[in-house]
Amino acid sequence: NRGLLALGFWVASIFSHVVFEEFRFFPFLSLYGDPRTGKSFLVLLLNRLFGLDMEGLPATKDNTSKGEKRRMSQFSSMVIPMLEAQEGSTRFDFNDLLPMYNRNPAQTRAATTNNNETIEIPFHATLTFVQNHEQFKTRAAMERVVSIPFADTDITDESFEHFQKLSEFSPENLSAFGDHILKNRKYFEVDIVNAVQSFSDLFVEKGVRARRIAENHAIAFTGFALLNSLIEWKTEEDVRSLTEYMIQLGKTKIETARSETPNADAFLEMLEGIPDGNAVRRKDNNLYLRLGEAMKAIEWPKGNLRELTAEFKRHDNFKGNKNDRVFGLPDPVKVWHFKMQPLSEM
């Protein structure tokens, strides 16, 4: 089931431009769990299926943040596996997942001119994180990732035998798979949006109540489902088992990323590490923030400002948004007011 769902994500990624055009987002994939359970071999195999003979991009401090983002911009509608991206041992910023989920630029900087010209590094690829331990700490990040766990107890004599057989295929032979997909691209391009919507509705009906999470998991599942319909590969029982597994993954994700306001949750959670000053003030059980200063303090991307402020207003702890003198400045300033409550208690 794990390998088939990962394959589905790779297939869906080839047509991610079609999915994004309709839904305005595309999820990330996380393959995580015990070492020596085949995660690295799986991503190498999947990349070779689509003509890319590489395991992925090692996420280490030897890579600069700009270098990684420029490398990502070289790919479009293809999966880039990020290998062992561990907080503290990589320059990759997991908060970048928030704007990249909506395919905002990986980086925007001012051009060396006197006008308002900017230079952007586009992001049109998809990302898979291959790691022993997941690094997604905020609800907002977790909600945007389809997580597939691997455990050493999953390895059997039969699965090891299949592993050995797959290892015998050359990259040249494996790439015929991707060629077959692209020769039938019209089939996928025509059906993928409706299929994602149908499977998303099914997952919601079966208990994956968070629509965003249902849609993320439906995208990965749709890649497999359309492939299976094209080549008539797996039995109905196999597909039923995989569907049930995907629904369970979605339900598990809801439990680990339970929130209707993930961006606001993440923003307020990051502010917990910012002392009182120009950005934030705390008084009794109240939190006051100046949005512009707070965004600078936590280096929050400006790309999803509208979504962020909309979530602020829906947040359970939101008390108001008005001009106030709480910051002690000569004139009142616009302030967002929240009741203070640790996210762990929500």
Please give the residue ranges for each predicted region.
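P-loop NTPase catalytic core of nucleic-acid-dependent motor ATPases
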Residues: N1-D62, H217, N228
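DNA transaction DNA-binding modules
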Residues: D191-M346
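Conserved AAA+/SF3 P-loop NTPase catalytic/coupling segment centered on the Walker-B
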Residues: V79-Y101, N132-E143
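Structural recognition of the conserved hydrophobic beta-strand(s) that form the central parallel beta-sheet
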Residues: P81-L83, T108-A110, P122-N132, V146-P149
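Phosphate-sensing "switch" segment of ASCE/P-loop ATPases
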Residues: I121-F123, T138-R240
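Conserved catalytic network of the ASCE P-loop NTPase/AAA+ motor domain
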Residues: R71-F75, S89-R91, T118-F123, K137-A141
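Conserved alpha-helical scaffold flanking the Walker A/P-loop in AAA+ ATPase domains
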Residues: P58-P81, A85, N116-T118
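Conserved catalytic/switch belt of AAA+ P-loop NTPases
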Residues: G51, F94-T118
